[in-house]
Regions:
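Classical Sec-dependent N-terminal signal peptides that target proteins to the secretory pathway
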Residues: 2-24
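Flexible, glycine-rich linker and terminal segments associated
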Residues: 25-43, 153-188, 192-200, 213-220, ...
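Extended interaction regions within the primary functional domain
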Residues: 43-51, 56-59, 75-81, 102-104, ...
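Transmembrane beta-strand segments that form the barrel wall of outer-membrane beta-barrel proteins
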Residues: 47-56, 79-91, 113-124, 134, ...
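Solvent-exposed loop/turn segments connecting transmembrane beta-strands
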Residues: 54-64, 88-99, 123-130, 195-204, ...
Length: 289
């Protein structure tokens, strides 16, 4: 009888522990769902795009960033879409780079095409490197095109380890498209050139990447190839996204490509090179990828 009672006590205790664990998991899931809903419903009006990213491939170190997009126009206006974008990057050797920009977009062709232009100012706070850029973009559900031109504003300045560095002029062109039947992915190709200073050779190269957009986070992998003066490298980027009510559905589409409305992308971030590419004195060293 005593042994039977002990077994009952153990059984009841196990059921209680299991029940409490299940309830704790349910409470945690409900809390996270409610928290995400709160962020999307409340912060989404202020910042339709907000994200935190971690990426590798920058001098074998991890780069962290936070980025937000804030509308300056009525969020329901599809003719005059005005917004500002700000970001802060913490890169190699604790370099802090601040990016501030303003952009204007417009929806065309029954909201199936989004075109825009933007201006940006970049400032590497630690060593006072400064740069500006102008860009244009065209976005649809079947492909995208982006062109950015960068202008170094600061001259030679004393950088890390008292080495002279200079922000470079340059440009990049990017085309992208989702994989067939997978509209929640994006395959992109980017070509870039940075103009060498003081007689140094220009740096040219390209980059391919594949991004998967899940609910609440994105994962991107790619490879950057240079023309020989700088080592090629692979990179991985993980981004936590917030405040977007229109989450991409994961699945296989009935058609390879379909032209649909991109009105939900009015306030997506401007894709550009946010880190300042610099040349070291008497050499060419890319610190800004």
């Amino acid at each position: 009888m005593y042994l039977l009672n002990v077994k009952k006590i153990i059984l009841i205790s196990s059921l209680l522990v299991f029940g409490l664990s299940a309830n704790a998991a349910d409470i945690k899931n409900k809390f996270m769902n409610n928290f995400n809903s709160y962020l999307n419903d409340n912060l989404g009006q202020l910042f339709p795009t907000a994200e935190i990213s971690l990426s590798s491939g920058t001098l074998n170190e991890v780069t962290g960033s936070i980025l937000v997009v804030k509308p300056l126009s009525d969020i329901n206006d599809n003719e005059n879409i005005l917004f500002t974008q700000g970001s802060l990057f913490l890169s190699d050797n604790s370099r802090e780079t601040l990016n501030l920009g303003i952009g204007k977009r417009k929806l065309l062709n029954d909201d199936t095409l989004l075109i825009g232009a933007n201006l940006f100012y970049d400032h590497e706070l630690d060593y006072d490197h400064q740069r500006a850029s102008v860009g244009i973009e065209a976005i649809s559900s079947v492909g995208s095109f982006r062109l950015n031109q960068y202008y170094g504003l600061s001259g030679w300045t004393t950088g890390l380890d008292n080495v002279q560095e200079k922000a470079l002029n340059g440009q990049d062109i990017e085309v992208g498209a989702p994989l067939p039947y997978l509209p929640w992915t994006n395959f992109s190709y980017r070509s870039f050139q940075w103009d060498g200073a003081s007689g140094a050779a220009d740096l040219k190269g390209d980059e391919i990447s594949l991004e998967a957009k899940f609910s609440g986070f994105n994962v991107e992998v790619g490879k950057r190839s240079n023309d020989g003066t700088t080592e090629d490298n692979e990179f991985l980027k993980i981004t936590w996204t917030c405040c977007s009510k229109d989450q991409e559905e994961i699945g296989i589409s009935d058609t390879a490509y379909k032209l649909t409305s991109v009105a939900d992308q009015k306030f997506v971030k401007v894709e550009r090179q946010n880190l300042i590419v610099k040349q070291k004195e008497m050499s060419f060293s890319v610190i800004g990828f």
